């Protein structure tokens, strides 16, 4: 059987957790930032519980069972490609793709190199540059050059492995925003928002013997296909359209972070 194709019996059962709220996306200061970044009304998180033990190697069976579950189908939210309104999955999922996303970072010191390499000044202001395009993004500062331009002088400040980290992915998504994104002049709002969302989604525990903090969540970037093609997170693929499944095997919860690129709420 090919990876990502349905298994007889499914194995997992899910329950929607509507009362699990994510303050990192709803606090007034954060919604103000998301509005500026053209992401408000197009990004959300939802939580579901599941009934069995989970191991990362089971990710394909887990994700397929998720999309087949009768408690998921009427509750999992996505943006309609035609109306731009929130809706639920209207087609049967035939195949899934779940890519492992490393999640090991426990500190925002991960981004200190942006200061060390003079991408951001000591004052926190992002260093400007001459405008250029990395389709569809306007690059007007050194931060976006580091995020997008592989041939830029300082692109190697973050290694390929570090760029795969969930914390880096969150940070990059916030920096790039939606289609009418108004960029920040300073770094702090991006770092603060990425940190809050990361802490809201990812579970940690203290090791009983060493007392060290450990991340217990597994993270997957997910796509689902119906008989026509990609149906989730959106039929229109874009670097800024994504869905991450953050699985806590101890609590048996999965947090789903979703965003669909477009024009966010302005009011």
UniProtKB/Swiss-Prot annotation:
Membrane-crossing residues?
A: none
Q: In which tissues is it expressed?
A: Expressed in the left-right organiser (LRO) node at 8.25 dpc.
- Could you list this entry's UniProt keywords, alphabetically sorted: Cell projection, Cytoplasm, Cytoskeleton
Recorded superkingdom: Eukaryota
Cellular compartments annotated:
Cytoplasm; Cytoplasm, Cytoskeleton, Cilium axoneme
Among Pfam families, the record links this protein to:
CFAP300
The principal localisation class reads cytoplasm
Task: Show the GO cellular component annotation of the record.
Answer: cytoplasm; cytoskeleton; motile cilium
Similarity field: Belongs to the CFAP300 family.
Q: What does this protein do?
A: Cilium- and flagellum-specific protein that plays a role in axonemal structure organization and motility. May play a role in outer and inner dynein arm assembly.
Listed under subunit, the entry gives: Interacts with DNAAF2.
| Name the record gives this protein | Cilia- and flagella-associated protein 300
What organism is this sequence from? Mus musculus (Mouse)
Q: Which gene encodes it?
A: Cfap300
């Amino acid at each position: 059987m090919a990876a990502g194709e349905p298994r007889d019996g499914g194995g997992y059962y899910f329950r929607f957790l509507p009362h699990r709220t994510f303050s990192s996306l709803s606090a007034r200061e954060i919604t103000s930032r998301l509005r500026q970044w053209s992401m408000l009304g197009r990004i959300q998180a939802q939580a579901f519980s599941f009934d069995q033990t989970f191991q990362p190697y089971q990710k394909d069976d887990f994700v397929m069972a998720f999309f087949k579950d009768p408690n998921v189908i009427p509750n999992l939210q996505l943006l309609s490609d035609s109306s731009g309104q929130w809706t639920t999955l209207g087609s049967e999922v035939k195949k899934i793709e779940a890519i492992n996303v490393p999640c090991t970072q426990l500190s925002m010191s991960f981004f200190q190199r942006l200061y060390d390499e003079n991408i951001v000044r000591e004052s926190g202001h992002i260093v400007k540059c001459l405008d250029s395009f990395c389709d569809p993004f306007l690059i007007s500062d050194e931060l976006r050059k580091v995020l997008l331009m592989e041939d830029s002088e300082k692109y190697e400040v973050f290694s390929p492995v570090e760029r795969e980290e969930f914390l880096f992915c969150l940070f990059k998504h916030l920096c790039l925003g939606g289609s009418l994104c108004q960029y920040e002049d300073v770094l702090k709002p991006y770092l603060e928002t990425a940190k809050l969302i990361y802490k809201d989604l990812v579970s940690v525990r203290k090791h009983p013997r060493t007392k060290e903090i450990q991340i217990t969540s597994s993270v997957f970037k997910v796509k689902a296909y119906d008989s026509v093609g990609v149906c989730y997170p959106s039929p229109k693929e874009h670097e800024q359209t994504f869905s991450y499944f953050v699985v806590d095997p101890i609590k048996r919860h999965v947090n789903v972070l979703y965003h669909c690129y477009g024009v966010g709420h302005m009011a």
